[in-house]
Design a protein with these regions (language model features):
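Short coil/turn connectors at secondary-structure junctions
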Residues: 8-9, 36
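Short, small-residue-biased leader/transition segments that mark boundaries at the very start
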Residues: 3-4
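Short, high-confidence coil segments that cap the C-terminus of an alpha-helix
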Residues: 7-8, 61
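Helix N-cap/beta->alpha junction signal
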Residues: 15-18
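Conserved beta-strand elements of the Class I
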Residues: 11-13
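TOPRIM fold recognition
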Residues: 25-130
């Protein structure tokens, strides 16, 4: 059995599990990187105790990508975490959602946009019967 994530040196941090799954899905859909090449962590809100515990358990992490929500609480907590990790020797990146409040909103919007440009199987079958 292979352990996929042990050697990853990057963690992407989200507020909610659905956002972490959406972030991974966006990597797959948009071909923006190896979705298995990073750890995904959901804080269950904006408290960063889970991040501290994760970093203790995975000391090899050198790159932290903060993907918190695009609202006041998410933006404030992002700045708090950046200050908290200052001097840790880790690279901290703020990657707020490009569309909507969170990464699930982004995934929904991207998926809807892709669907506008796709031909459905029903359309193909209907075209063949004409």
């Amino acid at each position: 059995r292979r352990v996929l994530f042990r050697s990853a040196d990057t963690v992407e941090v989200y507020e909610a599990p659905i956002d972490a799954m959406s972030g991974a899905s966006l990597k797959i859909i948009q071909h923006t990187g190896n979705w298995r090449g990073v750890h995904y962590l959901a804080l269950g809100g904006t408290d960063y105790a889970a991040l501290d515990a994760f970093l203790t358990y995975y000391p090899n992490i050198t790159h932290i990508v903060l993907c918190l929500d695009n609202d006041e609480a998410g933006r404030t907590r992002t700045q708090d975490i950046i200050k908290h990790l200052d001097g840790s020797g880790k690279t901290v990146e703020d990657r707020q959602p490009p569309i909507g409040k969170d990464y699930n909103d982004t995934l929904v919007q991207v998926t809807q946009e892709y669907q506008k440009h796709c031909i459905s199987l029903d359309d193909i079958l209907e075209e063949e019967t004409r």
